[in-house]
Amino acid sequence: ISAKMHGGVPEDYLEIHNFFDSSKAALPDVRHRAILHSSFGIFVAEKVFGVTVTNSEGKKVSVRDLCEEHVIQDLGFIPTPERWFKNMPIEPWMSGSKKKL
């Protein structure tokens, strides 16, 4: 889809799309999306890949646009991390109360 929208070939954008879906290695179901499929994940991807990528046609393409399109394609909108985690119970270990020194 990125190549159809922005030109070039799919391989021009594969590294970015693979980055978003890399969390499947840790959590191989739809919950993997909670890790990067959010406004914060898009911010992180822009830090990793830069503001633009240059496709094989020499055209500069916004990384933010590519990432937003990926998340919208998967979820229909761009959630915030707060939206992902608002119903997640807070466990005692999350505050470091179970640290072993």
What are these regions (language model features)?
Residues 1-101:
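N-terminal membrane-targeting hydrophobic helices
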